[in-house]
């Protein structure tokens, strides 16, 4: 495995890619909360995994090294003492857990998972009440009684959008934007990137041009490397102009960056024009059948 990052352009030979294989997070999608979790329908997990595996194998057949986000994070926990405990603290703090006793119950459940890869997958999948044995003091609260009819079985939301791995963090040349994402639903996804770029031996030394604790939001789908010296960024529903200001300052003042100009494209603020990569299509050449008209 080669170390570091190098993406001078979106067009060219792909050598390495980071994916996420759809997992149990899709099983924890409540049908009545799809819109909040940014889904239109509940995918069939088995088919989603089959299609993903086919896609990943096509990449491998073309000589692409396929990495998995869950494996990278698990490798960090395997190799770095204290990293998993640090992650667990932050994960629970950002999980939106309701109830005085529930965070400790969740911690005990997570700590009981010995295998680091299974632990990572569990944090991605979310957690339901049916998975744990809750004492009466935790399961019966004023909040649960008042909201009993509308209360979800979820203790922690799943992260069903994780297979869009470009959005939480995007490579810019030899550095990376670790994004603060538009929605609360997706912003927790960037926590995995934080630990990869903070601790993983292959990626801990790369430059960060944007950090997940920034007050402005941006997503990787709005960032396109045109060439080594030119970066395109969309001003969209998911990326604020102020975020591009922060990004630009960090890129231009970083001695390792080769980017000399950033082009900002103002696109409609709506989900239909979600990102710059939604409204722009890159290709090196177009092939048409000889009988096309």
Predicted regions and their residues:
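The feature marks the mature, well-folded catalytic cores of soluble enzymes
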Residues: 1-288, 292-293
């Amino acid at each position: 495995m080669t170390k570091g990052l190098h993406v001078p352009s979106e067009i060219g030979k792909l050598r390495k890619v980071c994916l996420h294989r759809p997992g149990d997070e899709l099983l924890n999608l409540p049908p009545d909360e799809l819109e909040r979790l940014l889904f239109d329908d509940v995918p069939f997990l088995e088919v989603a995994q089959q299609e993903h595996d086919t896609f990943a194998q096509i990449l491998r057949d073309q000589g692409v090294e396929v990495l998995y986000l869950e494996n990278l994070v698990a490798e960090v926990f395997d190799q770095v003492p204290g990293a998993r405990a640090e992650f667990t603290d932050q994960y629970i703090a950002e999980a939106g857990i309701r109830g005085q006793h529930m965070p400790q119950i969740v911690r005990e459940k997570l700590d009981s998972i010995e295998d680091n890869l299974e632990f990572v997958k569990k944090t991605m999948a979310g957690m339901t009440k049916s998975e744990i044995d809750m004492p009466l003091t935790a399961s019966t609260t004023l909040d649960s009684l008042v909201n009993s009819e509308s209360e979800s079985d979820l203790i922690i939301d799943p992260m069903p959008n994780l297979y869009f791995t470009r959005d939480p963090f995007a490579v810019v040349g030899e550095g990376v934007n670790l994004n603060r994402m538009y929605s609360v639903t997706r912003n927790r996804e960037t926590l995995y990137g934080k630990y990869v770029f903070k601790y993983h031996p292959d990626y801990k030394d790369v430059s960060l041009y944007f950090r997940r604790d920034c007050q402005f939001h941006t997503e990787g789908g709005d960032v396109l490397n045109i060439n080594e010296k030119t970066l395109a960024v969309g001003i969209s529903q998911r990326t604020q102009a102020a975020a591009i200001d922060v990004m630009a300052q960090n890129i231009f003042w970083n001695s390792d960056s080769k980017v000399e100009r950033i082009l900002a494209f103002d696109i409609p603020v709506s989900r239909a024009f979600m990102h710059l990569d939604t409204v722009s299509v890159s290709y090196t050449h177009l092939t048409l059948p000889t009988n096309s008209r």
